[in-house]
Structure formats: C-alpha cells, structure tokens
C-alpha cells in the first residue's frame, strides 16, 4: 500500500506573529456576539492579502480566536469577582 505524502507548509515566526496580531485586532474591534471564526479569518485574509482558509493558516487563526475568547472570559470573571457582594436582607 502506498503512502500519500502530505505537503507540510512551514510558516516563519514573523508571518505567524503577523497573522495572530491581525486576528487579535479584528476581534478587539468586533462585536463578539456577531463575529465568527470564519468572519475573522476572511477579514484577516483581506487585510493580509493571504488565503488563510487553508492549513496551517486556518489552525493559527483558530488558535488565536480561542486564546482571545479565553482571555476575555478570564477578564470578565476577574471584574465580576471585584464587584461588591450583594447583601441579602432578611425579614423578621
């Protein structure tokens, strides 16, 4: 049985950093209720003039979107934890 060789695309660190930075800027300026990974990837593709819909670019975008959302959730959780606790009144 023949093995099918998969072509691995190497991405240099500068390009990887540029993709992540572009995606992050897009997410920071977007309504997180409306933006999707696909929309972020398409917008980043236009800004970078690069097809990000194929691996390994697609994986980089997915990871950056996930990282961004995880950080946003942590930030919201931290801010909620700093709010004063609501004091329940008891009736006598």
Curated annotation (Swiss-Prot):
<dbReference type="Pfam" id="PF08766">
    <property type="entry name" value="DEK_C"/>
</dbReference>
<keyword id="KW-0539">Nucleus</keyword>
<dbReference type="GO" id="GO:0016592">
    <property type="term" value="C:mediator complex"/>
</dbReference>
<dbReference type="InterPro" id="IPR014876">
    <property type="entry name" value="DEK_C"/>
</dbReference>
<feature type="domain" description="DEK-C">
    <location>
        <begin position="13"/>
        <end position="70"/>
    </location>
</feature>
<protein>
    <recommendedName>
        <fullName>Mediator-associated protein 3</fullName>
    </recommendedName>
</protein>
<comment type="subunit">
    <text>Associated with the Mediator complex.</text>
</comment>
